Amino acid sequence: VDLSKVAYDIPMALFIKEAKEPGSLRFNGFYSDDGVTLSDWELKFGAGMAHGVAKLAAKGAQEITIQSATAGGIQGQGKVIIQDNHLGIVGRLQVLDLDHVYHHYNSDAEESPYSIDADLKIEQLKLSQKLNFGQVNLRVTESKGDLTSLKLISEKPDVLEVFVTPEKSGVKHITLSCHNAGDVLDYFMPNSDFEGGTLNLVGQLSGKPGHKVFKAEIDLRDFVVIKAPLLAQILSLSSLDGIMRTLTGQGVSFSNAVGHLEWGNDKVILKDIHASGSSIALTLDGTVNLLTDNIAVEGELYPINSLNVMLANIPLVGQVLGGGKSRGVFATAFNLTGKRQNPVISANPLSTIAPQSVKELYKKQVNNEK
């Protein structure tokens, strides 16, 4: 069968077959009352190829065995069973790069007549050139073009786990756990200056197609922030020169960062983000506009030292000056506004030694100026 005039593409595999490129389907087999049995078939399709055997039943399931296949950046083998409008896929892939899936997956694509149930072993699961999660097992289901469930677990314990539950009452629950969280964050937020760490995320996806909203709780443990020019400027404004030198050298260690985020309508909203380390702690609230790349974030930075902690834990002193045990007495209130890559930093030079009431007044003043 001549396929040279056929054009086709698989964006997630970075595969394109132009109409002018050669293409052919060759097969050997025999016909019986039960259907067609192909003892050998071979597909050549531009730079892609596949070969195997097949049983095409007159009634019931169609079974296609792929002994080897190559399409763009994907290589593998497996079996496809087709019955009515259901596709069952079992197989093995040599490499799968999630970068291609992330950039080409369309959650609002036209409805497909097929439901899919795939069970795959992936030898190398990658995220661009930043991360290699090693061997993973993937189970995914899809109905009418919509992802209904997903279970992704690395062979090596605690490297990567992702779960998506079937939708219930309009909500899908998503959980993620991975190591090397700094590299994952740097992929989605380039130049974030995080290294190492373990990320745990629990969230909910809801809304209509085209207006999906993802709300999640995040928990980031044992990471290091290195260089981070924005943080360095805030430290400088806070007169914390010693910590700033550590930041530009070996980095500042944080034991944990927790909070909430909301991602939808082309915005990321940060709520009650608290990060605490051996030398400093941070609080953050604000918005990142993904269309304009503008940010509006406010926060506080305070040093972790014995005097600051001691004063914050004195009931009356800590409540009046610091706002409670969870916040330091000596803290600098700051704001980030403008373009995300080069925002304007404003800080209250008096807030480092000011009572909590003065800090709140400063925040209100800045918000009014906006």
Language model features with spans:
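Short, charged beta-strand/loop "edge" motif centered at a coil->beta-strand transition
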Residues: 271
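Short, glycine-rich nucleotide/cofactor-binding loops
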Residues: 274-276
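A short, well-structured beta->alpha microelement
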Residues: 43-49
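Membrane-proximal interfacial segments on either side of biological membranes
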Residues: 1-41, 53-254, 260-268, 280-370
